[in-house]
Amino acid sequence: MALSQNIILRLMNRFPMLQYFTDRPFGIEIEFYGLDYVLAPIDNNIIKPYCISSRAKDGRNFQQLYKDFKIPIGADRDCWHFEKDGSVRGKGHTQFGAELISPILRGITGLVQAYNAFRFLCNIQGLNIDDSCGFHVHHGVDSKVFTCKQLQELVRLVYPIEEYFYLLIPGNRKNAETCKPMEIDVMAFLDVCDSESEKGSDKITQLWYSLENHYDPKSARYPRYDKTRYHGLNLHSYWYRSTIEFRYHSAVLNNIDEAMEWIIFTQFLIELSQGHVPNICFYPEANKWLNTIYMIYEKLGHENCIKRLAN
């Protein structure tokens, strides 16, 4: 408990935007290669903890390692678990491509779990990342509240600064097949929600699941793997699991602060899209994502909501 409190204090001091972090549910997926494991066809791509032979860098066995970091690794999708990831190349092969997937997390205590998960991965011998690896963040939304208008507002926020995301994020993510820029008809997307009518919601769904956006009708049989999900802003996840997924970011292992900043920043975008515009403080030495928030506020005409701290 003391360790968690120390991490919370560190995060609060390190990330000023954490004061606006809400209890909205979120989840993360961290891709990498180099995990030694075996997988049976009946495992449904879930890597059972007892099927992992990797050890800690200091020689501890795998089970002891995740217990020490208080990351309860399990064998189903309702807990922290590992899955095989065929999109991860890992020095030209996919044999050991994998990802660590979180359960549903909430608030600062969830952020502490995510922080510890990265520390846990950093201590596994042989784990590494390359350009084929990504770091994905899901933020939960209630479809009764987060409707056509909020989806529209989110696209309105993200689309003008999408290029900026790709510039700020390490690696050449813009050209990656798994996190492409928006390919929907954005102007049409922003023009269909004049009311909360069912007609507007149907139209926005049609615009997402279009051939232009790489929709494949055959994939409807396997909705989890719908091809429209391979965009930096994945709205397929909205209809599939009631989350908004941000896939822009490259994989993160050692630079844990970068991962924390991205989680906080992307949640803030969701809150903005729901009309939550808090007063925020101006910090001259703000990190790149807080600076991006300042830029968004200025573009939206919310300059008066940026408060300068007294000297």
For the regions a language model picked out, list residue spans one by one:
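Short glycine-rich beta-strand segments
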Residues: 140-142
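C-terminal accessory/tail domains of diverse enzymes
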Residues: 2-128, 144, 148-311
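His-enriched metal-coordination microenvironments in redox/metal-binding proteins
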Residues: 134
